[in-house]
Amino acid sequence: DCCYGRVNGCNPKMADKNYE
């Protein structure tokens, strides 16, 4: 939830989930 896309340097899997 704290991640929105890989640009934030979050976990790729989590980033993808929140980005989509």
From Swiss-Prot:
Contains 7 disulfide bonds. Heterodimer of an acidic subunit (CbIalpha or CbIbeta) and a basic subunit (CbII). The acidic subunit (CbI) is non-toxic, and increases the toxicity of the basic subunit (CbII). GO terms for cellular component: extracellular region. This is Acidic phospholipase A2 CbIbeta. Heterodimer: presynaptic neurotoxin. Monomer: Snake venom phospholipase A2 (PLA2) is inactive towards micellar phosphatidylcholine but is weakly active towards non-micellar dithiolecithin. PLA2 catalyzes the calcium-dependent hydrolysis of the 2-acyl groups in 3-sn-phosphoglycerides. Its cofactor is Ca(2+). It is found in: Secreted. Belongs to the phospholipase A2 family. Group II subfamily. D49 sub-subfamily. It is an enzyme of class 3 (hydrolase). Keywords: Disulfide bond, Hydrolase, Neurotoxin, Presynaptic neurotoxin, Secreted, Toxin. GO terms for molecular function: phospholipase A2 activity; toxin activity. Signal peptide: none annotated. Its EC number is 3.1.1.4. Expressed by the venom gland. Binds 1 Ca(2+) ion.
